[in-house]
Amino acid sequence: MKRLLLLMIVFFGGIVQVVAENTLFYDSKQLTCDLITSICQDKDGFIWIGTDYGLNKFNGIQFTHYYNNPKDSTSLSDNSVKALMLDNEGTLWVGGIGGLQYYVPEENAFRTIKFEESSSFHIMCITQLRSGEIWVGSSGRGIFRIRKDTGTGEQMTDIPDVSEHAHYGVIYEDRHGSIWIGVNGTGLLRYDPSTRTSKIYTRAVLDGGSTISGMAEDHSGNFLLSTGTTAYYYDRENDRFTKIEHNESWLPARSILVSQKGTRYLATFGKGLKVIQPDLKELRSEVITLPFIDVDNAKIRAIYEDHNQNLWIGCYHRGMVMVSKESTPFHFWSVPTREYPQAGVITALYKDDDGHIVSGVEGEGVFKITSEGNITCLLYTSPSPRDRT
């Protein structure tokens, strides 16, 4: 794999020894698809992974795949899964292009929710309010309240400024009882159930507000918001959103996760994983060292923390990364990619009498490396592709 010095592995700038993450990686060889959209853990500890082509259940050892079977009404309604949610009763809900379903583990089957109209519904998000009600946002069909006992969805028409024709990508209830709704193409809507009033925060006050991608509250009660281009925190006293500074020219944020320890992660599409600093004033990159994927530039569509505080990162077009909370005893060394841009996989390893590591690296040649991981010299340079022809 390109630029991997698999001594233990390549990472960044100049054969530097760094502590590695204890990680696992799964791609399309194990998953139904590497286009990951959503992640959730059920009451039995299984990790569910939604993709653009099928649903996966992971028991810690192997994956079970779920697809749509037109001849089986209890199968997945459509192979494109967009949202997963575990409710307070331990029921797993699955939303996607084929509508809304919930999983019945005793039967290993899915039950489909019926909506008022017979045509299919594209479900974009699922959330459960503190009252126990389950709301789903759809693409072009409005917002629905779900009744599991009757297996039906009822369109909500009593929320001001909510249109049955709009696209709703995110719904979140904060600790103050306000319900925040991301309206694609419009902005952010805040609904107060106690007064039945709404307020719209348009694209004029939210950069990238035409796409609301994520919402969360941290342990201090700060309401955090991500859009298609940046991230904000809500100044409740002044009823305004303040942009969180970063050093990127463009930041396509996709979701927010507040970990059990209080770390505030921001997943981005092509800019890797960021962390919102404690003072809410700055975003910094979260450095994750992996031998098989460059997380710093990954297109992260989904991020999730399981019961054991392991971090699951869904990298679009690449696969699933699991970062354990337990560190590994191994270390990685990296090759300076600017000086050695053609460095590939390790082809040979040898330790000489002086304690130096002599390593053959495909595409560059033979390096002599100290026990501290510093390159002392290039013993042999590989001929260029032109010279080899």
Model-derived features with residue positions:
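Carboxylate-rich, polar loop motifs that coordinate divalent cations or form catalytic acidic clusters
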Residues: 1-389
